[in-house]
């Protein structure tokens, strides 16, 4: 019974990765849209996009870490 609860909890915690994937998609969609509107700002927009990517991916990695902690503890 405890093993089943660990697997269910780990799966539910891993659902946070869905949000990270959506966030990364939104960040790079905004980058493509911004560069298509104003190509001269490509360098500055790319810097902001990488920062947004890192922040949204960090939340996904935290969710993955919690999932692994629930699974292997």
From Swiss-Prot:
This is ATP synthase subunit 9, mitochondrial. It comes from Mycosarcoma maydis. Belongs to the ATPase C chain family. It is found in: Mitochondrion inner membrane. One of its GO terms (biological process) is proton motive force-driven ATP synthesis. It is a multi-pass membrane protein. Keywords: CF(0), Hydrogen ion transport, Ion transport, Lipid-binding, Membrane, Mitochondrion, Mitochondrion inner membrane, Transmembrane, Transmembrane helix, Transport. The lineage of its organism: Eukaryota, Fungi, Dikarya, Basidiomycota, Ustilaginomycotina. Mitochondrial membrane ATP synthase (F(1)F(0) ATP synthase or Complex V) produces ATP from ADP in the presence of a proton gradient across the membrane which is generated by electron transport complexes of the respiratory chain. F-type ATPases consist of two structural domains, F(1) - containing the extramembraneous catalytic core and F(0) - containing the membrane proton channel, linked together by a central stalk and a peripheral stalk. During catalysis, ATP synthesis in the catalytic domain of F(1) is coupled via a rotary mechanism of the central stalk subunits to proton translocation. The record marks 57 as: Reversibly protonated during proton transport. F-type ATPases have 2 components, CF(1) - the catalytic core - and CF(0) - the membrane proton channel. CF(1) has five subunits: alpha(3), beta(3), gamma(1), delta(1), epsilon(1). CF(0) has three main subunits: a, b and c. One of its GO terms (cellular component) is proton-transporting ATP synthase complex. GO terms for molecular function: lipid binding; proton transmembrane transporter activity. The chain crosses the membrane at residues 12-32, 50-70.
